[in-house]
């Protein structure tokens, strides 16, 4: 998986604490949930014409959405329902313009649902009283009624064969006791159960089939009927689904590698294949397109694409931009399908963290712009904050949105008309009846889509600056494409600093006595962006009094920690601006936790056996704040009152590499509040990346410390974490695991 064939070494983490409710097998009768009257009308079904998804009248339909995982995992229910409310989350998605949700499931779950056997769901019914007493299928179908209420559509994605938080790591659509025939059976059951409910509009046949020429098993794409030919499997599964429900869209992803001209699939040469992301290689469509016969008009191809924080692909290791990514990666792997009018595309997964690597931000902005410019459908990865290498649109509390990620990356790709987000339901506006942010596809005019950008704003002027702000005004743009001007983007140089629906904006956070250049662009309801206005330059005021920040605190040291506190000391700062140092700001990570006036402070309220990082800034009487000190890291002491522990360790390996899943269970009678799992590699293995915990390796010793969202394990509760690594031929499992210095039982 980390081979020279440019495979994506990510194991994009779908893992979470199981801790509010233990998973207990319940034998329960299958309980049907009646579909509302609107769901039976069938007027929201979609099909394709050329490279465009359209509704039953032939009107363009752009699927603009997000992924929400959990039903694919061991919990078998949406993650986050241990703290977030299902109704509020769903309504917020709709109000923010998300008109479709891709829901990962497993074949194992579909077969369990078919058999009427359920696990007790991991749901906090205090936060979700509406889910009291419901099994996982009933929760899913209750959520479908919420989607109907708020105008959201859904499609299912078989993410893995087994109900496993790391199940997507396995290369194929089968695994263990789950066979290819089982996958067909699961899809046929789903197509039958929801054939009359147009809330569910499609099926993503299998998530990210992958594997390289060095893999024991790998997914290929050719014209054979071989067991490992994903093209044949996807074609067969799609035909079985469409024989039951001919109205569903079927989404077919790519594989990982494709042979260069003249190279057979039997070759193991490292340079014999084109490689890209799991699910992102659709080169085979040119030679071996999916053939669905009479149902060809239900086919959508669905590649995945990620940035360098997921894996540092070779195209990120040189200077790149949207043009080079299009020419080198997107074009030959999948964009040709859209550009040559073969079929529509839906980018099934894309997204990631912002502000950690400029290359990551550049990649995401480039793909964002491609999606908006080509009017592509997409489902952003991901709503969940507990996706280890991408983060989510929601923060760890499952209530607060990452406004920067949403507004700068996802929102510009959402389908808009006349300044409102467009839903795929013909009766219900996106956001529900009375929505002020959304409209219905039935309210959007048919005919040729609006691809005309607004006029560039004119008359940009700067008002009177202060030492840190510049007010801007301009004349309104016009739009002849039919969707109307929806707002404006304000740029400082090439940096987007704000958006507004008005023709004025005040830029803040500027440095005193400094020159800045500003420009403005208009956007219309279809997402088209104008050329930039003529630029205007303004200089901020010089300011008065002390504008010099104190020196940076030095010598930050952590004393002996307890289970809940850490004492800190540092050397005093100096101030040459004249107002003098008045105090300090102490930060835990990026969170301000105290403002002492002296050069010491004890941080309290911490979790036991947990790693923390602290920094200090100095503040003077004029309000100037220094840069942060060098950080100091410290791990709190174990809590002697925590319970016992048990660990299950399983690894999947290949030549030179492996992935491991680790389940930590609190077997004690009191909650485990903050934990660090420790073990040693016995065979010289090397950790490369991990998820759902903060991983570190020193020599052979490895530690995994809880994330904020899985810090507390109730008695009997478990958390699933994992990592990938390399080995030199021997991959012996660790023999001993410890938490807080105590040895865990190994299962």
UniProtKB/Swiss-Prot annotation:
User: EC number(s) of the enzyme?
Assistant: 3.2.1.4
Ranges of residues in domain CBM2: 638-747
Give the CDD domains listed for this entry. Answer: FN3
Q: Which UniProt keywords apply?
A: Carbohydrate metabolism, Cellulose degradation, Glycosidase, Hydrolase, Polysaccharide degradation, Repeat, Signal
* Molecular function as annotated in GO: cellulase activity; polysaccharide binding
Please name the Gene3D superfamilies in this protein's record.
2.60.40.290, Glycosidases (3.20.20.80), Immunoglobulins (2.60.40.10)
Q: Where is the composition biased (Polar residues)?
A: 465-475
Which residue intervals define the domain Fibronectin type-III in the entry?
456-543, 552-639
Query: Into which EC class is this enzyme placed?
Result: hydrolase
The text of the family note is: Belongs to the glycosyl hydrolase 5 (cellulase A) family.
Its protein name is Endoglucanase D
This chain's source organism reads Cellulomonas fimi
Q: What is the lineage of its organism?
A: Bacteria, Bacillati, Actinomycetota, Actinomycetes, Micrococcales
Name of the gene = cenD
